[in-house]
Amino acid sequence: MIVLRKWQADCLDKAKAHYQSHRDYFVQATPGSGKTRLAAELAKWLLEEQLIDFVICFAPTREVVAGMQRTFSAVLDQRFGNVIASAGAAYTYQSMEYQQEEFWDIFKKFRVLAIFDEIHHCAGHDPLLSNTWGQQIIRNIQDQATYTLGLSGTPWRSDDLPIALARYSDPEGQLICDYRYDLQSAVNEGVCRAPRITLIDNPLIRLVEEKENTESVRGFSCFSQLLSESPVSYEDLLRHDDILNAVLDIGILQLSETRHKTPQAGGLVVATDIEHAHQIAGILNAKHQSYVVVTSKTPRAQQLIDRFRHDNTCWIVAVSMISEGTDIQRLSVCCYLSRIRTELHYRQVLGRILRKMGPEDREAWLYVIAEPTLRKYSQRIANDLPEDQSTLQEKKLNDRLNQSHAEHANGNTVGAKESADNPISIKEQNGKGELQVTDASLLTLSFSQYYRQYLLSLM
């Protein structure tokens, strides 16, 4: 028998008391802390007390649904699949649109516990201001289910719409959680790994603009300055081989160190699109790293994810496949190279590497380009851990860097050219045409081989 974690037992007791007089219960718990196990234990208690007849679960993806089916089958010791069996079933939110009326009649004819994992995907309190999934909940479940359980690790939406079944304070409009288990508590109690978020920057960036018969050179001291004062975009950086090599080298080094202690540890690379994923895969291959690529176009992607979960492959490169709720405990290192810059998505990705494999498995590493928005999100996560101290690590910074700065200041670009191993034009590296300021302007971007690492970590 697996003993519940302290927070799970506490939340379970509070839920039992809450359901004596209320129908809806909302839990916010940090990703990787065991929300699904809590939900299964609560369902087991309600079934044993004969307060419900069935349990019906909804989740955002088939991968998460499969994980719920495994957990509920184990805890309930009964079949739990994608059809109503002895205990219940689990479905994707998308499937709600295609359910027949007979399915929704179950909520009217029987006592049902409806569980919504990552319920922030379902928006709205009324049909006019709801998304499709939220409308299904309002129409078919909200007033029909005997009990509801809403679960979320990141309980907000990028569009600021209210979450279905959630309650908000008035007039502040703050989400009211019946139980909250935050990242600080999860780390302090050893439930989750401590996140080590490393922002990767470059102190010596060279941008050459060729226009007609003239050439101008501009220098930048960080990515933030480059992005704000030049036509170069964040996605240009993500697709630049120099940047990819730098980020992946750091990730590979950390994964290698981790695998010395935990041989089955694996890494995740979050890519921008399918083309980008294969670009990253080519670099990993050149560095003799084992990997698998999973995208929406990958045949049998779910089987590949399941295989990676249990094998010894170093890296999984994913585009929107290793998402919230995906349980791959051996993931402990992540290179975030997605163009998506929302706090919701960023925290969800971080959650993929927080699950622990054992008591000695204490750290998770997230590597990200020091883009201003992602820097802000990283600092907010650090602020969730009051004991955190922001430290600066600079590797490979020496007198040569100072010399290169002086050469730039004096207009001498020879040293800068030597420090850029392989200057690549925007045209060559993104395949989408030249990056132009005017019709006759070509920009060539190159970087110093020296990268700064800003480490935000729990000390």
Model feature map: region roles:
Residues T61-V64, T92-Y98, A271-E275, V292-Q303, ...:
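Conserved helicase motor
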Residues S290-E394:
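Conserved RecA-like P-loop NTPase helicase motor core
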Residues L237-R239, I243-A246, I250, Q254, ...:
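Long, largely alpha-helical accessory region at the distal end of helicase-like NTP-driven motors
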Residues M1-F26:
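Conserved pre-motif I regulatory segment
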Residues I2, D160-K261:
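Interdomain helical connector at the RecA1-RecA2 junction of SF1/SF2 helicase-like NTPases
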Residues S33-L46, L51-F72, T272-E275:
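Conserved Walker A/P-loop ATP-binding site and its immediately adjacent core
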Residues V65-F107:
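Inter-Walker segment of RecA-like/P-loop motor cores
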Residues D105-G150, T154:
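SF2 helicase catalytic motif II
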